[in-house]
């Protein structure tokens, strides 16, 4: 659907955010199946739960503006999963897998953050301040997840560095 007006552009972007959030929830489930780290699994389960709440908020946005999500044809998330499956299958190290999964989570999360940032501005520009408020809360949830993911990565790296120092000191 080519967008010709600000409203059509907003509807297309909101539809894309809904689809991306829905697909991201499925990706979180698949990523969680690859990793054995309980902290990462917990984070993914929590994120999947929060994603369902975000979908509810986005659906409310559509209700407020009196529209339905548009049909989209993008394959970004399918390609993301295909590439992920190929790359992670070749990894042997559990630590490398954990970091890889978290890096992929970071990529996916930052795509969502960018979408929500634009949507908040677009909602305000089109006069849908209630919608902007709901989208801002979606953005906040996603920013928290990005920060938590960053902290998980830091924790894994700190443990790995400490292990290396212990080996070096023992030698």
Feature map (PLM): residue ranges:
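Amphipathic alpha-helical hairpins
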Residues: 1-171
